[in-house]
């Protein structure tokens, strides 16, 4: 057991160095996209979002959503799934747990 611990302690700096070297470029890429994608909407984007929601409601009322191509329908489904998943992530963060609320 002591031999195992000694080997682990000797190899730890090399493993940590390799992990840092491996993750630095990926972390830089993550931060680049996080700064671009995770910003709140600007005031100029809010009217466009409202117009888009009105367009969705109108297509649901008139039935024009039936004329979508398969690609458009799949993309709309993926966007809806992404919005739903971010809602669930916010719920998990707010609850500070995956299951139930602490009351």
Curated annotation (Swiss-Prot):
Pfam families: ATP-synt_G
Modified residues (N-acetylalanine): 2
Compartments in which it is found: Mitochondrion; Mitochondrion inner membrane
GO process annotations (BP): proton motive force-driven ATP synthesis; proton motive force-driven mitochondrial ATP synthesis
Protein name in UniProt: ATP synthase F(0) complex subunit g, mitochondrial
Subunit note: Component of the ATP synthase complex composed at least of ATP5F1A/subunit alpha, ATP5F1B/subunit beta, ATP5MC1/subunit c (homooctomer), MT-ATP6/subunit a, MT-ATP8/subunit 8, ATP5ME/subunit e, ATP5MF/subunit f, ATP5MG/subunit g, ATP5MK/subunit k, ATP5MJ/subunit j, ATP5F1C/subunit gamma, ATP5F1D/subunit delta, ATP5F1E/subunit epsilon, ATP5PF/subunit F6, ATP5PB/subunit b, ATP5PD/subunit d, ATP5PO/subunit OSCP.
Positions of modified residues (N6-acetyllysine): 11, 24, 35, 54
Function field: Subunit g, of the mitochondrial membrane ATP synthase complex (F(1)F(0) ATP synthase or Complex V) that produces ATP from ADP in the presence of a proton gradient across the membrane which is generated by electron transport complexes of the respiratory chain. ATP synthase complex consist of a soluble F(1) head domain - the catalytic core - and a membrane F(1) domain - the membrane proton channel. These two domains are linked by a central stalk rotating inside the F(1) region and a stationary peripheral stalk.
Database matches in PANTHER family: ATP SYNTHASE SUBUNIT
Species of the source: Homo sapiens (Human)
């Amino acid at each position: 057991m002591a031999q195992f611990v000694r080997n682990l302690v000797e190899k730890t700096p090399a493993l940590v160095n390799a992990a840092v070297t491996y993750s630095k470029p990926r972390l830089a890429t993550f931060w680049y996209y996080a700064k671009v994608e995770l910003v709140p909407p600007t005031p100029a984007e809010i009217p466009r979002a409202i117009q888009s929601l009105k367009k969705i409601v109108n297509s649901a009322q008139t039935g024009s959503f039936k004329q979508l191509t398969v690609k458009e329908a799949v993309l709309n489904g993926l966007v809806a799934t992404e919005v739903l998943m971010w809602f669930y992530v916010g719920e998990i963060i707010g609850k500070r747990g995956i299951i139930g609320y602490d009351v």
